[in-house]
Amino acid sequence: MLAHHTSRTPRLCGSRYTGRPDDERVDLINNVFYNWGPTNGGYAGEGGSYNFINNYYKPGPSTATKTSLVHRIFAPNADDGSNSNEAGVWGKFYVAGNVFDNTCPDIQSNATSMKNIESVNTNNWNGIHLNGTPPNGLLTVKSPDPFPTVDISQHNAEMAYEKVLAYAGASYMRDIIDIRITDEAWNGTYTYEGSNGSTNGIIDSQADVEGYIEYKSAPRLRDSDGDGIPDAWETANGLDPYDISDAAEPFAGANGYTAIEVYINSLVEDIMRDGLADAESASTEFFPPMYNPPTPTKTIISRAKAPTLWKITMYS
């Protein structure tokens, strides 16, 4: 998820530093973009192959100030030859299933923006805005088929939006910044402005928002051998809580994953499973088996169906 950024939704480097367009492959799937602009949106991609599939674009108050960005998926341009590519190299793009959201009040008040969003939702290629004139026009950059990549679980764009807001991020628990940003994306709003002239949700310093949060630690669970795995988990899963070496040993039935990897995975396995559920195309996901999986004790915050509510589920 990218939110509240003036540009780069995203900026794709292409093969300009390698000169090998055949080696540049990007799979952009199931991302959420909110409130980009007004400097720019997604652009560049000088050489390479790109899939833009089932992404969810939600233009916000900052996007609304530049109409040309409201319905942009990407603006490809040719390489200028100043690095490793030959001058004139374009990327190739496959776009399908991407959805633009028109519910932000700043967007709904602009008839042109509403019309353009309808246009790109009808035909995603209306969201590819060429920056320059390739030899054969849009055909130069257009691929009729997706480029082959590794198999992953995919949702449609609308479901991806809900999944990202509910489950995305590398945090075991979301902090107040994560919660604020996902809430703003859901409601099409913003909370802060910059201290140096930026407006509409764009900031100029971390001091303009919550700053750097001081995180508090909790007492750690008993770990007699100091291997990073609590005694209770080791005992429940056939390990020796007084043997420091078993944490780095392969865990039974885990395809080579070590015991400590299986333990760490167990902390967020329920989040991962919920995030991957209801996929329209699913790859085989491997979750290492445990003899006695722990009962989650954390607070999981997820979206309720009503757009302005949070549903907080406590597990014990």
Predicted regions and their residues:
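Right-handed parallel beta-helix
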Residues: 1-17, 22-37, 49-61, 94-102
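Glycine-rich beta-solenoid repeat tracts in large extracellular/virion proteins
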Residues: 8-22, 39-46, 63-87, 106-112
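Substrate-binding/catalytic groove segments of enzymes
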Residues: 35-41, 49, 58-71, 101-123, ...
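Extracellular/surface-exposed low-complexity segments
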Residues: 90, 99, 104, 109-216, ...
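Extracellular calcium-associated, cysteine-rich motifs in secreted modular proteins
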Residues: 206-298, 304-306
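Short, intrinsically disordered C-terminal tails of secreted or membrane-associated proteins
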Residues: 310-312
